[in-house]
Amino acid sequence: MSPNPQFLFDFGSPNAFLSHEAIPAIEKRTGVKFDYVPVLLGGVYKATGNMSPGESLRGIKNKPEYNALETERFLRRHNITTFKSNPFFPVNTLMLMRGVVAADFEGLFEPYFRAAYHHMWSEP
């Protein structure tokens, strides 16, 4: 049997939140179970000399409008009603991501994960 697909996430990524919201239907439809793996995106960007799409695409004509349209399409397609833009975005998630690793060691991954995502993207 092949290994479970991994879902790499950072609480600060709205796209990761939206993907997470779509995963239960994928798991139900396919019978696969995703393994959730925390990844500090800021660290990845720094280590690779890159920057977030929000920074690298800033100033491109019509990009914010297109992103908003695509987000709305995704929300409708996956029947996601819990998403709200975070007025504090972008957020430094270093402590949140360290916290989820610690919570996992303590057997508290699920409640920590749900609370962090809820307060980041459902009720910021």
Where do the language-model regions lie?
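Structural alpha/beta surface segment adjacent to cysteine/selenocysteine redox centers
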Residues: 18-120
